[in-house]
């Protein structure tokens, strides 16, 4: 983890995300990646979040 991810994760923690989720979301945002998770409670505007099944259907089928 670098300082940029840590700073963004800290901001997300203030908004209520648990620390592990804040780190994962921050990493996905900063790397412009799709977040693949089974945790349907994770939401962040502008971040594409898919379940593993949705990812397979969208990108691998």
Curated annotation (Swiss-Prot):
Keywords attached to this entry: Signal
Domain of life of the source: Archaea
Signal peptide: 1-30
InterPro entries reported for this sequence: PIN-like_dom_sf
Name the record gives this protein: Uncharacterized protein AF_0063
